[in-house]
Amino acid sequence: MRKRLKTRIKICGMCSPEDMEMAALYGADAVGFITEVPIESPRKLDSDTAASLISKLPECLDSVMVIMPENSSRALELIEKVRPDIVQIHSNLPSVELEVIREKTDIPIIKTLSVPAGMGASRVQSPVKRLLDEVRRLEESGVVDSILLDSGIAGKTGGTGYVHDWDLSRRIADETELPLILAGGLKPENVQEAIRIVSPYAVDAASGVEILGKKDAVKIRSFIEEVRCANAFL
């Protein structure tokens, strides 16, 4: 059985210095910058803006650059320009490409994996088997430092704001030694229950701490307080 550790907190989708200040003030551990992704998102930044924000980041926070690169060359280009503490690969980059990033940088790598949302366990046996197989391959290859499970729905592999079946995430967590970050529809009202079920290394929130597409101080504070309450029972 895995030893339960206190769950860390990542607030994703930073767009301004004010967003970063709120995350730092209330005690987040890391913040995410969605950079140069080829999809529409209100949180998408160009690489110049991401680099500028990260250069001003409070020292108490780790910076996570979230990217969807088509190959390792593009990932390395963005890492060199933006200079985050951690890179999160939110695309189907094969292990051989991840290995190139690993060999050419010493930056920790998070690999996003998509868990089907809106289905019970009986309907997702095949997707979950594929996920488990992929997690095992990633762990055996040693090309990533952690995995992030996000909710996929209607062709989108994450950032949907939907919750998936946390029992599926717990099953994956129990099958790997890789640190597991839980995302997908997390908000102050449900994060304690998510932590109780999954026991993740970290939780990741974006839209769940926003009002009308903007980060909200009350929601960020409440989210972090709820995580701390969950941690108090560990």
From Swiss-Prot:
Cysteines joined through disulfide linkages: none
Any GO BP annotation: L-tryptophan biosynthetic process
Listed name of the protein: N-(5'-phosphoribosyl)anthranilate isomerase 1
Keyword Amino-acid biosynthesis: yes
GO molecular function: phosphoribosylanthranilate isomerase activity
Record lineage: Archaea, Methanobacteriati, Methanobacteriota, Stenosarchaea group, Methanomicrobia
EC number: 5.3.1.24
Superkingdom of origin organism: Archaea
Alphabetized UniProt keyword annotations: Amino-acid biosynthesis, Aromatic amino acid biosynthesis, Isomerase, Tryptophan biosynthesis
